[in-house]
Amino acid sequence: MPAWLLAVAEPVTEATEGSAEKGILDAILESNLINIAIILSLLYILGRRVVGEALAKRREGILEELRQAEQRKQEAIERLAEEQQKLAQAQQEAERIRKQAEANAEARRQELLQQAEREIERLRANAERDLSAEQEQILQELRRQIVRQALSKVEQELPQHLNEQVHQRLIERGIQMIAR
């Protein structure tokens, strides 16, 4: 029997030997104390094992949860490292694409500038050609007008200066020029 049970039971037995006449109430009280002591002893003996097993199971459960949490933490760290690596690669790819886009835009800008320069040169050449053609046309028109005016003036003045001899000489010269 455990020592604490003996310590509780000893005063109870002394009380029962010295006072048998105290009555039924004392007997009930004494028996209740004994019953409580027995129940507490049984609870201690049986409960220690049950509580110990429950605590051991709980401890194992907590340890398992800690192991799983540590494993999840490690997996999360690995995934984080992978995702950070992917992010770094994506940022490098984005930077490469941005630089390529800038290079393409610059090349396109240069191409458009060259195209515009060629178009300007073509328009200048066309304008010069059109201007030359128009100048030539205007000169020809001026020559025609001058010839018409000269002919008109000659026709007006010729009859006044022309006599029969001069007329005959002009005809002969014209024939000689044709004959040559």
UniProtKB/Swiss-Prot annotation:
> Where does the sequence pass through the membrane?
33-51
GO MF entry, a single one: proton-transporting ATP synthase activity, rotational mechanism
Transport is among the record's keywords: yes
Q: Where in the cell is it found?
A: Cellular thylakoid membrane
Q: Which keywords does this Swiss-Prot/TrEMBL entry list?
A: ATP synthesis, CF(0), Hydrogen ion transport, Ion transport, Membrane, Thylakoid, Transmembrane, Transmembrane helix, Transport
Specify the protein's topology with respect to the membrane: Single-pass membrane protein
What's a single GO CC term here?
proton-transporting ATP synthase complex
Note the subunit structure. F-type ATPases have 2 components, F(1) - the catalytic core - and F(0) - the membrane proton channel. F(1) has five subunits: alpha(3), beta(3), gamma(1), delta(1), epsilon(1). F(0) has four main subunits: a(1), b(1), b'(1) and c(10-14). The alpha and beta chains form an alternating ring which encloses part of the gamma chain. F(1) is attached to F(0) by a central stalk formed by the gamma and epsilon chains, while a peripheral stalk is formed by the delta, b and b' chains.
The similarity annotation says: Belongs to the ATPase B chain family.
- Provide the function of this protein: F(1)F(0) ATP synthase produces ATP from ADP in the presence of a proton or sodium gradient. F-type ATPases consist of two structural domains, F(1) containing the extramembraneous catalytic core and F(0) containing the membrane proton channel, linked together by a central stalk and a peripheral stalk. During catalysis, ATP synthesis in the catalytic domain of F(1) is coupled via a rotary mechanism of the central stalk subunits to proton translocation.
Full protein name: ATP synthase subunit b
